[in-house]
């Protein structure tokens, strides 16, 4: 499933085409994805100007003038692609063959920019776990977004805040970090990478780094910094291309080439002087990768 860096990469890819453009045609080619499309879906968007394209956690938000806010989730395999009048490959940009059948093109947005340039934005989702819903008013009050926790970007998430979120929690540290009500947008890949950078075991009790001790304060600060840096690095690399994820132009993200532990079972730990090896364990049905030698 695309995580926050992948969704942010998609947002940045769509933004130049969608923001300020007018929706001249909106076509939903089936009645539902994971959920049914909102009533009068096409009618309520057609003719509207897109004022902003935002992101909250793993959700995209499309704001239109005098209309509802469209909330979109990519699900397991959802992706957008952009088609223009000039669809030649951009020099210097890596492209790969699309493996997805156009039979899974479920939503089409035709837009015209202020300068008259026309584009088509297509949502493709083979597994149909993605969805599009309307928020009337602020999207922050929509049930899908209302309970989300702090964003792991910028400097909001620091050691003090992280310790307050984890205080008293007896669940494994990795499980607590995946709780979207605490920190919004973190997923399996980047939690594993952040815990390795911070030198903390995913198996340890979450509340142990929130104790009133110097060591715990250092651990919470180290983990907060690791979370922020992993997310920032992944966004800069365009996300991680695993299985279904691709950019809006069909190119791949590259952060997977920087993985220290994720999907590297049996390999030597890359931390200098460690000497350990990456192990895989299953937590709550998900694979966890870590080094027991340098993560405690």
From Swiss-Prot:
It comes from the Bacteria. GO terms for biological process: base-excision repair. Its EC number is 3.2.2.23, 4.2.99.18. It catalyses: Hydrolysis of DNA containing ring-opened 7-methylguanine residues, releasing 2,6-diamino-4-hydroxy-5-(N-methyl)formamidopyrimidine; 2'-deoxyribonucleotide-(2'-deoxyribose 5'-phosphate)-2'-deoxyribonucleotide-DNA = a 3'-end 2'-deoxyribonucleotide-(2,3-dehydro-2,3-deoxyribose 5'-phosphate)-DNA + a 5'-end 5'-phospho-2'-deoxyribonucleoside-DNA + H(+). Keywords: DNA damage, DNA repair, DNA-binding, Glycosidase, Hydrolase, Lyase, Metal-binding, Multifunctional enzyme, Zinc, Zinc-finger. SMART domains: Fapy_DNA_glyco (SM00898), H2TH (SM01232). Its cofactor is Zn(2+). The keyword Methyltransferase does not apply. Binds 1 zinc ion per subunit. The active site is at 2 (schiff-base intermediate with dna), 3 (proton donor), 58 (proton donor), 286 (proton donor). SUPFAM superfamilies: Glucocorticoid receptor-like (DNA-binding domain), N-terminal domain of MutM-like DNA repair proteins, S13-like H2TH domain. It holds the Pfam family Fapy_DNA_glyco. A zinc finger (FPG-type) spans 260-296. DNA binds at residues 104, 127, 169. GO terms for molecular function: 8-oxo-7,8-dihydroguanine DNA N-glycosylase activity; class I DNA-(apurinic or apyrimidinic site) endonuclease activity; damaged DNA binding; zinc ion binding. Involved in base excision repair of DNA damaged by oxidation or by mutagenic agents. Acts as a DNA glycosylase that recognizes and removes damaged bases. Has a preference for oxidized purines, such as 7,8-dihydro-8-oxoguanine (8-oxoG). Has AP (apurinic/apyrimidinic) lyase activity and introduces nicks in the DNA strand. Cleaves the DNA backbone by beta-delta elimination to generate a single-strand break at the site of the removed base with both 3'- and 5'-phosphates. Belongs to the FPG family. Monomer. This is Formamidopyrimidine-DNA glycosylase. It comes from Mesorhizobium japonicum (strain LMG 29417 / CECT 9101 / MAFF 303099). The gene is mutM.
